[in-house]
């Protein structure tokens, strides 16, 4: 069935009609082949069916547009003329490869069909043309298998089983060791497998094969693995794939033929040396699929020195032309080199950073280009774990299992799992999994993504497993041939050692070593990565946004400085309360707060002085005793953090969390009370427990996150906020006396009205003045608020009258704007919303520009109109998300704040936002 299409739509582009700038229309593979052809490089002739045809096909009931078949036939005729072979003809037959290729590289996620155009008659003509029936029948059996799998949806397992049986019968281990006669038997068995599965053998009509293959490639855009990959990598689902149709180049014609993949630099380390591998007497899928372990590319120099020299020259020229590391696929047919593809290479974070920095020094790109070239998220992957130096060599020797090729760096420890689906399920349950396979396939993508590392017994450093894990930043070891995987028994052997599924192993993707059991891992320091520091130095010179960190302890503050933070954007004081040694005092303070506040109001006294209040209740005395203990602890806390940060700003949020977070659960206390009654505990103990239970019950709320917390606590129980401000200013004064410059900024949380800010600021300013007078020094401080409710955003102009800075608490603001509970939504419906396209992104991961973002812009504009020098930033988890950082730059914020380990990400993302907006 065909569909009428506008005559203006051009379906097909010859290689001489395109160039590298046409990736949206011709896909990355097609546009780069056009570019290489334009440069006069040795590319097999072919043409590209555009991505627009794919989009039309998928949106119009999987119907090819009218006229496409005719366009394909016209271009096949041109192909025949250029190569001197005939498609669908026995003499000098032309076979085709039909390959997918979207604008964004998706290695192995879509389908490819090779050796198309063959049948029982044409295989004889191919054998005659090749002068050898073995490669002809090898091509035929490959075609039947891949066509059956991709076009007819036949299970691949029976083909692999039959092929293995034929090799065993012949007494050989490799596919190319089978003779022509043996391959004819394989062909017959493969036909029968297809017939058993579908009711008929694959079509013998080359034109039917071709059109069915084109449709199959289009359909592969929406396979589960392709959708999963796009979801994981945030790739647009609507771009579609092009289809590249090329004359087949045969790498399986004998020892003077072969195929391989090379990178112009090391994709794991970024070292400026050609890196890759090849197979003689093979086709390209053998290398990528990892079914054979290839030879390193350097050894090609000894086998085919002229081809090696030509290949090195082409690799250098392509990298210079594209000004980026290239991933090049090539095939050698009877000592003649052909390039099948070039693309910007997938690489590890370390390689991405090193390549970008080195290319600046080599004059290939500018600093700005280098900053835009490295994905900001990649920076966090630089700090991949490594084995601890404390592990002795004796332990490593004792635990050693096997060594393979290091394909992607990083150390990991996990539970052995042999199945991708099971690995994903275990990972979802919180289990660290290492996926161990003979080789991985594109359908394993969900398991690879879920695993902490991947080990394969076959394949090379350019195989599917290696390419995908490098892109994911996960450790990977390939070609670990000492490991024999028995999938049926659920175990693998390495020499005399056996490891069963469910047992622990450790792996080092940098050395290729696999060890039994669990080994300690540590994360490296950013200080040890000179190229990363150079790139981030350029980022700091470029960005307009400040980058601060969310930290609560002096050690975290020191780590934040190492990561490049310019201050602390959020210090959560309630986290200091949760230390088990402090909880008794904190609980004593909170449980008696209401009684103490009632007494204070009745006595009309701002400050409690025990020696002057002999008639106050024990509860009041307990409250102020606990308050004093907590004040001393908080003073020490703030002293430590302010000391580490020096003159940098430190934004300290006053107590925000609901009180129940510091108290035992009501249900737990109730059970404890029942147990005391059951054992006949003393009356005094029972009364104490009952009093505690009553107090906890009085503080319980139906919806505590929208209840008695934040500034509402500060207004209800002013002594708590006064204590905290006294501790902050006292700590600052202590350091000022030592000659240090400090800049605490006091943040009042959860305001909804300017009157809250007015009352609290007036009261707390008095406390700050009293402390400074008592200490005899001045401390530079500011008061500001956290904008985390819609009303605060909408009335920001009024609130700015009492605030010297705003900090958007985007976690709570997102919850309130959407009406979603962050703790519950993901597991209940949010993931489904995103998968089904109800929402484009997780609003808790990236700022929602239409809702939350609009409120932020309203607040920024209103706040700055009232107070032009108002300091504005965000301190939610969004502060380390590159998309959110870009939004903050556009919205005119002064800074973002995030966890210390996300600071480098934010620094680079802020520079990229500045460059993209300039």
Which stretches of residues belong to each language-model region?
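Short beta->alpha connector loops at strand-helix junctions that form conserved
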Residues: 47, 457-459, 478-481, 571, ...
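A short, small-residue-rich loop immediately preceding and capping a beta-strand
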Residues: 452-458, 476, 873
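Extended, non-globular alpha-helical segments
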Residues: 403-443, 494-534
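Nucleotide/phosphate-binding sheet-loop regions of phosphoryl- and nucleotidyl-transfer enzymes
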Residues: 2-396, 421, 431-434, 441-443, ...
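Flexible inter-domain linker/hinge segments
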Residues: 214, 383-389, 393-414, 533-552, ...
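Residues forming the flavin
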Residues: 472-474
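Conserved alpha/beta-domain cores
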Residues: 99-100, 526-534, 538-918
């Amino acid at each position: 069935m065909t569909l009428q299409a506008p005559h203006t739509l051009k379906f097909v582009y010859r290689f001489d009609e395109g160039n590298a700038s046409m990736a949206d229309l011709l896909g990355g593979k097609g546009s780069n082949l056009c570019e290489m052809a334009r440069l006069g490089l040795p590319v097999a002739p072919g043409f590209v069916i555009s991505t627009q045809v794919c989009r039309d096909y998928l949106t119009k009931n999987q119907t090819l547009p009218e006229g496409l078949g005719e366009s394909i036939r016209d271009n096949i005729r041109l192909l025949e003329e250029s190569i001197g072979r005939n498609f669908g003809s026995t003499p000098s037959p032309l076979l085709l490869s039909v390959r997918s290729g979207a604008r964004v590289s998706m290695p192995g996620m879509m389908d490819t069909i090779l050796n198309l155009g063959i049948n029982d008659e044409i295989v004889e003509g191919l054998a005659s043309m090749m002068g050898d029936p073995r490669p002809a029948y090898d091509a035929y059996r490959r075609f039947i298998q891949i066509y059956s799998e991709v076009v007819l949806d036949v299970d691949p397992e029976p083909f692999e089983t039959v092929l293995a049986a034929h090799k065993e019968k012949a007494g050989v281990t490799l596919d190319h060791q089978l003779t022509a006669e043996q391959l004819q038997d394989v062909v017959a068995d493969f036909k029968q497998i297809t017939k058993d599965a579908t009711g008929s053998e694959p079509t013998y009509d080359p034109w039917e094969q071709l059109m069915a293959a084109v449709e199959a490639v289009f359909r592969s855009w929406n396979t589960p693995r392709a959708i999963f990959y796009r979801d994981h990598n945030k790739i647009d689902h609507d771009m579609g794939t092009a289809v590249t149709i090329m004359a087949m180049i045969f790498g399986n014609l004998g020892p003077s033929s072969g195929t391989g993949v090379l990178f112009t630099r090391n994709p794991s380390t970024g070292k400026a040396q050609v890196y890759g591998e090849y197979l003689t007497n093979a086709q390209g899928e053998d290398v990528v699929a990892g079914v054979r372990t290839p030879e390193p590319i350097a050894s090609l120099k000894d086998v085919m020195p002229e081809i090696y020299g030509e290949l090195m020259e082409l690799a250098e020229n392509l990298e210079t032309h594209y000004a980026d590391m290239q991933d090049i696929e090539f095939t050698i047919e009877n000592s003649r080199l052909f390039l099948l593809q070039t693309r910007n290479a997938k690489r590890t974070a370390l390689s991405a950073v090193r390549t970008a920095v080195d290319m600046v020094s080599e004059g290939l790109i500018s600093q700005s280009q280098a900053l835009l070239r490295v994905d900001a998220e990649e920076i966090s992957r630089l700090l991949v774990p490594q084995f601890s130096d404390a592990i002795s060599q004796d332990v490593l020797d004792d635990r050693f299992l096997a060594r393979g090729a290091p394909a992607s760096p990083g150390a990991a420890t996990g539970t052995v799992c042999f199945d991708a689906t099971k690995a994903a399920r275990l990972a979802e349950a919180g289990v660290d999994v290492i996926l161990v396979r003979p080789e991985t396939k594109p359908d394993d993508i969900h398991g690879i993504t879920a695993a902490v590392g991947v080990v394969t017994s076959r394949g090379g450093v350019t195989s599917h497993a290696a390419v995908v894990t490098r892109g994911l930043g996960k450790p990977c070891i390939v070609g670990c041939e000492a490991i024999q995987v028995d999938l049926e028994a659920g175990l693998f052997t390495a020499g005399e050692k056996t490891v069963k599924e469910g047992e622990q192993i450790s792996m080092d993707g940098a050395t290729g070593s696999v060890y039994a059991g669990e080994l300690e891992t540590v994360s490296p320091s950013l200080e040890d990565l000179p190229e990363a520091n150079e790139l981030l130095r350029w980022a700091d010179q470029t960005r307009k946004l400040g980058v601060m960190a969310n930290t609560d302890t002096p050690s975290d503050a020191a780590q934040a400085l190492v990561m490049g933070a310019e201050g602390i954007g959020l210090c959560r004081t309630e986290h200091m309360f949760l230390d088990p040694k402090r909880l008794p005092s904190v609980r004593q303070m909170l449980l008696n707060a209401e009684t103490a506040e009632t007494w204070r109001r009745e006595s009309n006294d701002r400050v409690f002085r025990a020696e002057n209040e002999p008639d106050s209740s024990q509860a009041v005395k307990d409250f102020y005793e606990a308050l004093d203990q907590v004040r001393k602890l908080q003073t020490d806390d703030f002293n430590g953090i302010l000391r580490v940060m020096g003159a940098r700003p430190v934004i300290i949020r006053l107590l925000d969390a609901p009180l129940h977070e510091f108290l035992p659960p009501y249900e737990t206390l109730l059970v404890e009370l029942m147990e005391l009654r059951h054992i006949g505990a003393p009356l005094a103990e029972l009364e104490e427990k009952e009093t505690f239970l009553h107090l906890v019950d009085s503080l319980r709320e139906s919806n505590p996150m929208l209840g008695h917390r934040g500034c509402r606590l500060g207004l209800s129980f002013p002594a708590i906020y006064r204590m905290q401000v006294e501790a902050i200013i006292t700590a600052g004064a202590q350091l000022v006396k030592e000659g240090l410059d400090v800049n605490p900024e006091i943040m009042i949380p959860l305001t909804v009205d300017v009157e809250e800010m007015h009352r609290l600021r007036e009261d707390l300013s008095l406390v700050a003045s009293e402390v400074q007078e008592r200490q005899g020094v001045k401390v530079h401080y500011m008061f500001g608020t956290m904008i985390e409710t819609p009303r605060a955003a909408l009335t920001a102009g009024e609130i700015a009258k009492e605030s010297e800075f705003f900090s958007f608490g985007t976690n709570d603001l997102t919850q309130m704007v959407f009406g979603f509970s962050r703790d519950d939504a993901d597991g209940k419906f949010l993931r489904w919303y995103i998968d089904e396209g109800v929402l484009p992104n997780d609003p808790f991961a990236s700022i929602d520009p239409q809702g939350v973002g609009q409120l932020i812009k309203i607040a920024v504009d209103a706040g700055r109109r009232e107070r032009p020098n108002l300091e504005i930033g965000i301190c939610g988890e969004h502060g380390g998300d590159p998309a959110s950082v870009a939004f903050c730059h556009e919205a005119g914020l002064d800074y973002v704040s995030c966890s210390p380990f996300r600071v480098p990400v934010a620094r680079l993302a802020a520079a990229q936002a500045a460059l993209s907006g300039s």
